[in-house]
């Protein structure tokens, strides 16, 4: 009844699907899918991890940059949020997905690994006057906690039900059977012990929450911080964590242990940065 993994799925053709999951879990996901494959050979499955690369283009000028490096149409009307298309970047074939993990307008560019240097150079050359800069996984983590985006292995886990992790809108027990439904229904009858919240951590001058830190209320452990970082767009230290459902209220005061020091923390609304998703669903008028 928990969350085993998370996938982005692109339908490439009538009977061909391209699946993307967390790189660190590729072996686990590969074996799990194989275990559910029909035994009659009607479905073929291939692990492309070692032959594919991914570059992420994100930010308010992402569309302008993509139009410079491709002849395909990246307008909002033609390339809507949460859609995917096969495009060309330079002379490289690319599966472009209008999704990203940072809460800004952007695309994931999935490509044969042998084209990666070509695509990277093409992007960097075309984006010089736009202020384009490379960024790494720690910067991405900072951006994702500002949006309350959930990470497999921390906020999403077999340890927590999808209801506890805030995935209610994706779970429909009455629409037909799915893997884990029976276990999830039993879990619902028993009741849930946790609820995912976003917190502002106060007075963190030299350290932010990294994860697996106890959360306290009146001296008692009432939850666990699953992840965190300093949010530079918000100018605040942000943490995600599981707490007892009765404490999961906006404005609730708690404490988090960071490196042996107690820090005051306040529960915020989910997705404290760009709550309206304006940047994610940006139209051309948002580009500047």
Stretches with model-predicted labels:
Residues 278-287:
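Conserved small/polar residues in nucleotide/adenosyl-binding loops
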Residues 27-28, 63-64, 115-121, 208-209, ...:
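Short, conserved charged micro-motifs
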